[in-house]
Amino acid sequence: PPIPGVENVDYWTHRDALDNKEVPASLTIVGGGVIGMEFASFFTSLGVQVTVVEMLDEILGGMDKELSAMLRAEYAKKGIKFLLSTKVVEVSKGETGITVSYENADGAGTVTADKLLMSVGRRPVTKGFGLENLNLEWTERRCIKVDEHLQSSVPGVYVCGDLNGVSLLAHTAVREAEVAVHHITGKEDAMSYRAIPGVVYTNPEIAGVGMSEEALQAAGIPYRAVKLPMAYSGRFVAENEGVNGVCKVLAAEDGTVLGAHMLGNPASELIVLAGMAIEDGK
């Protein structure tokens, strides 16, 4: 990432964090997205003092904002410090650890920890394959444009996964590959992204499928939101003592499900059912 001083410190990527053999006493995570929050959850459970620095005004950008705030509150109770709407301006190595200098509405500040995890996203590899020799149409974010069959602007060239930049999820790439093979072999099929679930494996889990309230509001689509506390489930209460959980369903005026978002440890299992309802038009 283009942060002054980052090239001079031995920071972690998510792969480094997984390969690490020792538990640090403290950890700063730059980036409060999916990967950042999953590692924050993991290291907090090991007793590590974690600080999350996020440029946006809420963690988990792209997920339901209300539920993301609820998850953040749960982890604040567990001791994670969050610095939101905060820009990292410099990284340096000192005798007491790695120091991250930042700026936000409260002014300038620093946070020092034993380890630094950079979780600000990854870029797909686009060089070294000869792609520059093809007359491919690219997006502004250097991803390859595709149609509903995953075919690029060059007939016979199909692009699945992160390189098309639509949905950076492994299960999405599997479905995209299926659609591409069907098109190549003459079977009727087309890619739809409206009901692809996403899960953040924190504790509690948070999951979503379909449109969020923010997306519906931005698109000017009328909807109603129905929220049901997970506390209505005896199993949830038994397994998640003291934890807030909620299931939020977003529906059109005729009752068609447009999106569903859940906070609570059954979320990764239940979200698939919500996706089925969206795909079926119920």
Predicted regions span which residues?
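Short hydrophobic core segments
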Residues: 1, 29-30, 50, 111-121, ...
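Short loop/edge segments at beta-strand edges and connector loops
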Residues: 13-15, 84-86, 92, 140, ...
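Short phosphate-binding/catalytic loops that engage adenosine nucleotides
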Residues: 48, 80, 136, 221, ...
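FAD-site-proximal beta/loop scaffold in flavoenzymes
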Residues: 7-24, 110-183
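Flexible, glycine-rich terminal cap/loop adjacent to redox cofactors
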Residues: 185, 202-212, 217-282
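Glycine/Thr-rich phosphate-binding loops of Rossmann-like dinucleotide-binding domains
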Residues: 1-2, 37-38, 126-128, 167, ...
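Rossmann-like dinucleotide-binding cores of NAD(P)H-dependent redox enzymes
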Residues: 18-19, 24-28, 34-109, 166-174, ...
